[in-house]
Amino acid sequence: MLAQTFKKPHRAVLEQVSGTTVFIRNKRTKSKSSLSPLAQRVVTQLSVMSASRKQPKLLKLAREDLIKHQTIEKCWSIYQQQQRERRNLQLELQYKSIERSMNLLQELSPRLFEAANASEKGKRFPMEMKVPTDFPPNTLWHYNFRK
């Protein structure tokens, strides 16, 4: 019985072997109504172009649920804004501290200051060129970077 099943490789077959039902699924085939490669390419291009215009569906909420939703959204945006302000304040304080220490170094030892700010010959990728970020950049590389 199983030998007959394998003669039809492109179909799912339901067989009864010794009182039990066996479901055998084989290789899928393309449907006969598939588009030509040219038509498929056009469909793909149109779907890619329209992907940027697709908007999520508007929520249809009751009035109370809408008020709750808007309140939560507003609180979330305020929280995000506070986080950004905290982060910016911390970065500003770090920058001012670095600036003060560099000015102090310049006053105390101009020779050390020059050595600290000297460009290193043969260094292909300066650390100042890229900073660590949470997300990948829009432009992958700055080809015209000069120090």
From Swiss-Prot:
Primary location: mitochondrion
GO molecular function, one term: structural constituent of ribosome
Alphabetical GO biological process terms: mitochondrial translation
UniProt GO cellular component terms: mitochondrial inner membrane; mitochondrial large ribosomal subunit; mitochondrion
InterPro entries noted in UniProt: Ribosomal_mL40, Ribosomal_mL40_fung
Keywords: Mitochondrion, Ribonucleoprotein, Ribosomal protein, Transit peptide
Superkingdom of source: Eukaryota
Cellular compartment(s): Mitochondrion
Transit sequence range: 1-26
Additional free-text comment from the UniProt record: Present with 6300 molecules/cell in log phase SD medium.
Subunit structure: Component of the mitochondrial large ribosomal subunit (mt-LSU). Mature yeast 74S mitochondrial ribosomes consist of a small (37S) and a large (54S) subunit. The 37S small subunit contains a 15S ribosomal RNA (15S mt-rRNA) and 34 different proteins. The 54S large subunit contains a 21S rRNA (21S mt-rRNA) and 46 different proteins.
Function, as annotated: Component of the mitochondrial ribosome (mitoribosome), a dedicated translation machinery responsible for the synthesis of mitochondrial genome-encoded proteins, including at least some of the essential transmembrane subunits of the mitochondrial respiratory chain. The mitoribosomes are attached to the mitochondrial inner membrane and translation products are cotranslationally integrated into the membrane.
Similarity comment text for this entry: Belongs to the mitochondrion-specific ribosomal protein mL40 family.
The protein's name in its UniProt record: Large ribosomal subunit protein mL40
Gene source species: Saccharomyces cerevisiae (strain ATCC 204508 / S288c) (Baker's yeast)
Lineage: Eukaryota, Fungi, Dikarya, Ascomycota, Saccharomycotina
Gene: MRPL28
